[in-house]
A protein has these predicted regions:
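Beta-lactam-recognizing serine transpeptidase/beta-lactamase-like catalytic domain environment
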Residues: 1-33, 38-216
Length: 216
């Protein structure tokens, strides 16, 4: 343990704050490959990619003057979109992001609620740190497409992905379902309204299908 004797009140308070900090809400991070689900849903919704579209991965993707590598430096070779998702192939998702373009990518980023806080019933939720749209070139778009060069909270990503696979209805995470008395009787059931529709149900079903292939 830590001896609090002789510690300033400010230091004590700082340590208490750190102890109660919830990184899922209070901290942002680069989501990485988990964010490919967002690019997938946007690409399918906009019709710029379909399940059997053909891709080729030589181990990198050239974007402007940059060679952006796949995690598999030897490359995945020829694959369709579903296989590209199974392989978590960076060049495939870069290509989908570039097909969407910056304007459309931002449109879906906002549509999927990623610029908003989730509204979870806990304090201190942090916001998304994203490129300004006007400063976003093809290289930035490429890196965002597979979850790098920007930051979001884990709870924001989890809420959005849940919404994209539940039929397309935006959810707000909550902790309580009911208030109960000490003997277990329900005093009050907590009801929450449904969120807005952020993705077509058929597209949501397709996203779910692809993700099932990834883990099978």
């Amino acid at each position: 343990g830590m001896d609090a004797e002789g510690m300033s009140e400010e230091k004590k308070q700082d340590l208490l704050n750190q102890m109660w900090r919830n990184p899922c809400l209070n901290d942002t991070y680069e989501p990485g490959s988990t964010f490919k689900i967002i690019t997938m849903a946007a690409g399918l919704a906009e019709g710029v990619v379909s399940l059997n579209d053909s891709f080729y991965c030589p181990g990198y993707k050239l974007v402007e003057d940059r060679r952006i590598h796949c995690a598999n430096r030897r490359g995945h070779g020829a694959q369709n979109f579903v296989k590209g998702a199974e392989n978590s192939c960076n060049p495939v998702f870069i290509e989908v992001g570039l097909r969407l373009g910056t304007d459309k990518y931002y449109q879906y980023f906002r549509q999927f609620g990623l610029m908003e806080k989730t509204g979870i019933d806990l304090p201190g939720e942090a916001g998304t740190i994203m490129h300004q749209e006007e400063n976003m070139g093809e290289v930035e778009l490429a890196t965002v497409s597979f979850g790098q060069s920007f930051q979001i909270t884990p709870i924001r990503l989890a809420a959005t992905v849940s919404s994209l696979i539940n039929g397309g209805t935006q959810i707000t995470p909550h902790f309580g379902v009911a208030i109960e008395s000490s003997d277990g009787e329900t005093v009050k059931a907590l009801e929450y309204s449904n969120g807005r529709k952020i993705l077509d149900g058929k597209i949501s079903e397709t996203v779910r299908y692809i993700l099932e292939q990834v883990v099978e």
